[in-house]
Amino acid sequence: GMTIWFDTGGSVGDGYGTIVQNGAKAAAADMGCELRLLYSDWNPETMITHFRNAVAARPDGIVVMGHPGDAAFGPLVDAAVKQGIVVTSIDTALPETQARHRAKGFGYVGTDNYTQGKALAEEVLRRTNLKKGDRAFVWGLKRIPDRGRRAQAIVEMLEQAGVTVDYQEITPEIDKDPVL
């Protein structure tokens, strides 16, 4: 049968990772796949290590969280695809890698982070009394490619509405805890 290595992104038992894990288990059961779940504690370096270990085991497929970004994952995915391993990304897109390997099964399951951030800001403006000249605090991950597009959109939409935004970048220590 088919073997899939699947990085849930988080830690065993965390809220988001459990949802992703349960979906992967259900899909594997539906397709008759052997599933190897990996937990990276939201650490991009650990995600890369897990990917290298997965490639060494030569599964049929690997599902990654794109948090490390195209620069880090791209060459590794290139090598895996050359070995015949199908790779795909969830949660955080790898647009350059996907463009290169779409024809060999590389896809993306998740949201468009900019659209998501824009929708959130529009809803905040609709539900609150924020108006031109008011201040809002936003924290996000603008430093991280793709994931940062959500915070970027929130800031842009609020500023377009005349709201002064006080922005704080989320530290890596806080980012690894999905509860926060």
Regions found by a protein language model. Give the residues of each.
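A residue-level marker of the well-folded mature domains of exported/periplasmic proteins
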Residues: 1-180
